[in-house]
A protein has these predicted regions:
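Low-complexity, Ser/Thr/Pro/Gly-enriched N-terminal "stalk/linker" regions
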Residues: 20-115, 140, 292-297
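Active-site acid/base region of carbohydrate-active enzymes
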Residues: 68-93, 132, 145, 150-154, ...
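C-terminal capping/lid segments that line or modulate ligand- or cofactor-binding pockets
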Residues: 117, 170-176, 180-190, 298-306
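Bacterial Sec-dependent N-terminal signal peptides
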Residues: 1-20
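Alpha-helical support elements that line or immediately flank enzyme active sites
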Residues: 115-149
């Protein structure tokens, strides 16, 4: 009996350690895969970025950039114009090349924070940088997020230069805010790049569906976290919850409004691309989520949404 108990304990420790990757490298159990928990999203099968070959592009000099970038004219505001050019100069200095074996597929402009790329930062950076399209394909920065999409549609909000996610997908701080479609739509209406629109639509639709499946309460409203919204310095969760890491068991207004905005954008994209089947649910989502917000989150007294 004593021998059986010891054998059971050893076996249990081995299995537990395997799940936590704690077994020594020489152990025959070391390379056993962890259970695959992905629920596959069919739209991800259309994601061409996941199998795209990396393409590196070195930006030309800042002097060349000044000849092709939009040149502002604002009489009496020379300092502001100097700031404009300085912003471009700094941005160009922060163009990075994808590391070998990282899985990144495009040269990209980095937020210049900790060496990682951030969903929030790069969405806004590409909105600004679309005006520099004649100089450098800054929009391709977002390709690196798309190339890292998981089989269920998840995209991590922060990804290291080596291509690894900074958070597990079920971490409350792992993703968001969902602003990538906004950047892509602005790019499309300015340049009419049908080829890019066709490539990004299934990626963005799959990510939208992941959020709907994994970031909602039973009534269809959305939750997030301080890091997930990008507003970690705005305390709003009840006392006892962490401002940065917790959802506070709350309905998060900004996350709800972003999904309404994104659903509208995906509707427009789907209309142009004739993806009628995929966009049906977006109309229903807009209607039901808007109705909830107007009924429960609008203050007649303050004239404000909470």
């Amino acid at each position: 009996m004593h021998r059986k108990i010891i054998g059971f304990i050893v076996s249990f420790m081995a299995i537990t350690a395997t799940g936590q990757n704690l077994m020594p490298s020489g152990s025959p159990l070391y390379k056993l895969p962890y259970k695959n928990t992905y629920v596959m999203e069919t739209l991800v099968a259309e994601n061409a970025f996941r199998t795209m070959k990396p393409k590196k592009q070195i930006p030309e000099s800042f002097e060349h950039a000044k000849r092709v970038l939009p040149e502002p004219y604002w009489e009496g505001h020379s300092k502001e114009i100097d700031m404009y050019w300085k912003a471009w100069q700094l941005g160009i200095k922060n163009v990075c090349q994808p590391l070998d074996e990282s899985g990144f597929v495009s040269s990209y402009i980095a937020p210049a924070y900790n060496g990682n790329i951030f969903m929030w930062d790069d969405a806004f950076i590409t909105m600004f940088c679309r005006y520099g399209r004649r100089y450098f394909p800054f929009q391709n920065t977002l390709n690196n997020f798309y190339s890292k999409q998981h089989p269920d549609g998840f995209i991590c909000r922060e990804i290291r230069a080596d291509g690894s996610d900074c958070f597990g997908r079920y971490d409350p701080t792992s993703t968001g805010p969902n602003l990538l479609p906004w950047s892509e739509w602005l790019y499309y209406i300015q340049f009419g790049d049908d080829s890019r629109l066709n490539m990004v639509f299934p990626v963005l639709a799959a990510y939208y569906k992941w959020l709907k499946l994994n970031r909602t309460w039973r009534n269809g409203t959305y939750w997030s976290s301080g890091w997930g919204t990008g507003m970690d310095n705005m305390p709003r969760v009840p006392e006892g919850y962490n401002t940065i890491y917790s959802n506070g068991h709350m309905v998060w207004l900004d996350a709800c409004l972003q999904q309404i905005m994104v659903a509208n954008i995906l509707l427009k994209m789907g209309f142009y691309l004739e993806r009628w089947q995929e966009i049906e649910e977006f109309e229903d989502d807009i209607r039901s989520l808007s109705d909830y917000i107007n009924r429960h989150m609008w203050s007649e007294k303050d004239g404000f949404l909470y």
